[in-house]
Curated annotation (Swiss-Prot):
The gene is CPP3. Residues 1-28 are annotated as: Disordered. Keywords: Cell membrane, Lipoprotein, Membrane. This is Lipid-anchored plasma membrane protein CPP3. It is a lipid-anchor. It is found in: Cell membrane. One of its GO terms (cellular component) is vacuolar membrane. Present with 861 molecules/cell in log phase SD medium. Belongs to the CYSTM1 family. Palmitoylated near the C-terminus. The keyword ATP-binding does not apply.
Amino acid sequence: MRHHQNMHYAPQQQPVYVQQPPPRRESGGCCRTCCHFLCCLCLINLCCDVF
């Protein structure tokens, strides 16, 4: 049964869509500041307000 095996092993012509998180521009505005790393981790919330 070549037909059955062929369907199982189909050439992947469709582009593989990698699930990437949407760019958080509004939610993570502080991420653009100097303390982007700490702000993104929600460790220093004051950093966002100061800068």
